């Protein structure tokens, strides 16, 4: 259907209070918002080919909750740019370390069973997601 990009984001208020990290090493001095269900999403690949293991006081298994925590100024989160970039445009979030944390694209796929059980509503949903993912391009 398309590609999902993940980047680091934090609220302007959080960054004003805690400072903007200048390097991957600086992240160890920041509050990080991590995934509680998918541990592989807490390993943040770097541009230099290494990775940073994110640990933090806040975690969730839900992108909407992680987004709300980041907007509320609780820390830095690695989130889908599809969700966060519109919030950057609104001034609610800022990108962090875009030149140091790898923007690893993740392919988004959908599968349907063949045959008579294909519902038009399912097809319409998949078509909508495909259009949404393909019209959303990285801004960084």
Q: Where would I find each of the regions flagged by the language model?
A:
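A general structural signal marking secondary-structure boundaries and capping sites
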Residues: 114, 133-136
